[in-house]
């Protein structure tokens, strides 16, 4: 039996008998605003595990990049290749292989979520996003908008490419290769999602550098937790119907929790506890994770 090495917001990482292999165990927990909600979503972990595995296999089949997936060994578990994690900024050796890149890469295709809120505050400009100054929520960007955030700080923070290079100590060519992979992966996701009437709005991804420092896609992506999705038919009618964890965020924005939490963090106070979800929202969320697995993969859940 292995031992638990790490307890994340939505999954556990366990050791195995092979020192180079780890086991991901996905839980039914759900988190928003870097807080774990004290409500469980039935079969959510299974949905995340199976959805990510679907994307990993497609990406390998199309030769986009390597991945760390070894095999799916249970409905809510998978085996992955271990990568070394070095949290100290700038400390990763330039010749190290199978090492985690301590950054998150966000790719946006439509104006929504936190990008919309930053756009309204003037923190993101029309020129940066490739949209008109008077554009509305949900506007399609003229080209994908890439952002980099920190990984090992208390809260994720948007950073420049220059700071990303300092924190990770990877080369500019390696960062550009990561960006290139993100765009290719998102093109694949967009193509597959469109088959079942879905729009891929945005998403985040994490990487390692594997053999010969080649880019390796790791962790989870292309799910309702890391990515945002809309219904394509509704979008054509001018409506952005959230088919992702965003509607859970919207619930807490509506209750005022998000504003209270932001105020506490801005003043350096302790986070206020996040309340449980109403049963109706739990049921709707469980149904969403099940139905979206089927729409994303064209497989039965």
Which residue ranges define each predicted feature?
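Short, flexible loop/turn elements at secondary-structure junctions
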Residues: 28, 109-111, 207-211, 221-222
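A short glycine-rich, hydrophobically flanked beta-strand micro-motif that places a catalytic Asp/Glu
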Residues: 70-71, 193-210
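Short acidic, Gly/Pro-enriched loop/turn segments at secondary-structure junctions
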Residues: 116, 212-217
């Amino acid at each position: 039996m292995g031992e638990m090495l790490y307890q994340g917001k939505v999954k556990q990482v366990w050791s195995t008998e092979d020192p180079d292999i780890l086991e991901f165990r996905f839980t039914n927990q759900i988190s928003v605003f870097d807080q774990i909600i004290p409500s469980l979503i039935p079969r959510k972990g299974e949905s995340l595990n199976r959805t990510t595995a679907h994307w990993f296999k497609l990406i390998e089949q199309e030769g986009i990049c390597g991945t760390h997936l070894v095999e799916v060994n249970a409905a809510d578990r998978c085996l992955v290749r271990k990568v070394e994690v070095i949290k100290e900024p700038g400390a990763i050796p330039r010749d190290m292989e199978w090492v985690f890149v301590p950054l998150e890469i966000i790719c946006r295709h439509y104006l929504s979520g936190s990008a919309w809120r930053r756009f309204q505050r003037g923190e993101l400009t029309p020129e940066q996003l490739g949209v008109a100054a008077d554009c509305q929520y949900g506007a399609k960007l003229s080209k994908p908008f890439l952002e980099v955030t920190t990984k090992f700080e208390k809260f994720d923070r948007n950073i420049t490419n220059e700071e990303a290079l300092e924190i990770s100590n990877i080369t500019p060519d390696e960062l550009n290769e990561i960006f290139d992979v993100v765009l290719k992966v998102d093109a694949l996701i967009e193509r597959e999602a469109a088959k079942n009437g879905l729009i891929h709005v945005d998403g985040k991804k994490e990487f390692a550098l594997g053999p010969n420092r080649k880019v390796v896609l790791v962790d989870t992506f292309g799910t309702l937790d890391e990515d945002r999705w809309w219904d394509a038919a509704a979008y054509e009618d001018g409506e952005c119907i959230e088919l992702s964890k965003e509607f859970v965020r919207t619930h807490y924005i509506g209750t005022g929790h998000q504003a209270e939490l932001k105020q506490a963090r801005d003043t350096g106070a302790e986070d206020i506890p996040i309340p449980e979800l109403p049963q109706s929202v739990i049921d709707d969320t469980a149904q969403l994770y099940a139905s979206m697995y089927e729409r994303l993969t064209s497989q039965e859940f």
